[in-house]
């Protein structure tokens, strides 16, 4: 009798796992970014956290990227960061927030910024955030990069 119920639990567990994992893969393929992306810069000087609004990213619809610069291994906002916000499609830059205002870089005094962007077509994209200075002190360029697909 125990064996019969054990098999039942295994089968039910298999179906639930398949259902939920299948849902995750379907959602990911439609341009949903993880709503709490956190990555260290290549040199480890900062951690970069990105959230999106709306959650589902679609072509020809504006999405707002909220970027928080954090001190490494903490939840503390790092103030006075020199950076850029770049969008790359298939490895080629299609947008640079700094170039939009004819500047080599941007500066956030608060350590947090929201940047709107509209993807014009489906494809493989990266959000690249180069960091060039912290607290008014230039650093060797570092970056955080987040990759995703828009369908």
Q: What are the residue ranges of the model-derived segments?
A:
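N-terminal soluble domains immediately following signal/targeting peptides that reside
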Residues: 25-151
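Secretory targeting signatures
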Residues: 1-32, 67
């Amino acid at each position: 009798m125990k064996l019969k119920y054990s098999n039942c639990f295994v089968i039910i567990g298999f179906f639930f796992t398949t259902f939920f994992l299948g849902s995750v893969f379907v959602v990911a393929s439609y341009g949903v970014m993880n709503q709490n992306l956190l990555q260290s810069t290549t040199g480890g000087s900062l951690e970069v956290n990105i959230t999106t609004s709306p959650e589902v990213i679609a072509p020809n619809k504006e999405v707002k990227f909220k970027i928080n610069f954090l001190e490494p291994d903490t939840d503390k906002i790092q103030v006075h960061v020199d950076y850029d916000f770049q969008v790359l499609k298939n490895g080629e830059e299609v947008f640079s927030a700094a170039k939009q205002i004819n500047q080599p870089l941007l500066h956030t005094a608060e350590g947090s910024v929201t940047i709107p962007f509209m993807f014009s077509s489906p494809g493989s994209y990266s959000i690249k955030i180069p960091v060039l200075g912290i607290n008014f002190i230039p650093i060797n360029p570092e970056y955080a990069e987040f990759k995703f697909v828009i369908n």
